[in-house]
Amino acid sequence: MQQRPQSITARVALATSLHRWAWVARGNGLADTVTAESWRLFNERIQRPQSILEGAAKLPPPLCPQWYSEMMIVGLAQGWDAGRMKDIFDRVIQAELGYFYLDLQYANYLLPKWYGNAGDASSFAKNSADNVGGDAGDEPYFQIAIILISRGNGNFPVQEMDWARIQPGYQALCTQFGTTNRANNQVAFMAYKFRDASVARQQFEIIGDRWARGVWRDRQFFDRARDWAQGHDS
């Protein structure tokens, strides 16, 4: 920032680092699982990225698309109401930035564990994908499904999502960017959640022993899901 005082990107990058530091204190669990000291640290730390982002908004346009994403994370932390959060999201839609990470942030905000009601997040995922249409819409549907199912703390009803649409979304992602071990783990994880043993087995065979901690959290969960897939014929 000192070398490039007019750089929006530098400010957004700093805000990203700071808000992650704030969430380290809080964690991603439900509010009643957070200690008083963790809340204190979280509320103290989250103030600075908001201040930095507000300062970045005063710089000459255009705003970096990631600015909106980071501001939505601040909004989640600050408990913004639905109208204020949607205003940020709608500004991105109107600018036609094509930045699907905003969809991920908004879908996460709509989870019941945060500020949405049952069905809000899954309806948003469907509408977003339908608005794009085709393979181009299925791809973000896959990405949003990962967010909703993995961040729902085991309480998100997977049947709200369309497994038949998630799978072509994964294929569209692979076609555009190629496959990754993390993506393979994500599909195996969702196949387990949807109780699709056939797809789960295929992915576990590809994965081998290369389990992704960011997907499964611990090795025991990975082993349990793999054992389940291998023990079922359908």
Show the residue positions of the predicted features.
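Short coil/linker segments at helix-helix boundaries
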Residues: 1-6, 16-133, 139-168, 206-233
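Short coil/turn motifs that N-cap or connect alpha-helices
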Residues: 10, 100-101, 180
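Alpha-helical tetratricopeptide repeat
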Residues: 12, 69, 184-185
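Intrinsically disordered, low-complexity segments enriched in Gly and acidic/Ser/Thr residues
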Residues: 149-202
